[in-house]
Amino acid sequence: MKIHEEILKRRYVIKGILNEGSRPVELAPPENNSSHPLSYMELPFDPEYTLYNNRMTPEFLNNVSPDEQYWAVRQGVILRNTGEFPVEISGPEAEKFANVIFTRDMSKFKLGRCSYQFACLHNGGMITDGVMLHLKKGLLWMAQADGELFKWYEAHAKGFDVNVKDPKVWVSQIQGPKSMHV
């Protein structure tokens, strides 16, 4: 059996190990493999992390069975810290610029609303998807799924009066039928 076939049979995770002292060199700079600010809330469940958008997100909780997780979200409430990567698009031509990147017409996208969006190549191939927030005129946040989209923004921003940046925020989800009580 070839070595790459053996590698494909394995699941690779990042395990949290108590560290006393300075940050390990392998994890520097801190922008790489960064963890959600609320990750400490996951520690009692002995999480195993995977990289998603160059951010650590829990893939498996060793102290909670998959059945317990399923029923918690179906009958109760859960807080899930996700790896979606928010990108801020701002400026007088933010909506016009978004029409070049995404498939849905921004003129139909009301202020204060969210919209499921697809970023596509010129030939129609999908790059990634995510949830767009229309915060105010000239200000959009795209919480994108895993995939490299930032360079695509930069490549298409020329000629538009827009600013594309990482707003340095994280996404969390509160899910389940009892979520409105939290």
Model-inferred region functions:
Residues K2-C120, G125:
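Acidic, proline/glycine-enriched N-terminal capping motif
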Residues V131-V182:
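Acidic, low-complexity central loop/insert segments
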Residues W71-Q75, I127-G130, H156-G159:
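Short amphipathic alpha-helical segments, especially helix-boundary/capping motifs
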Residues N123-T128, L135:
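Long, hydrophobic/aromatic-enriched structural stretches that serve as scaffold segments
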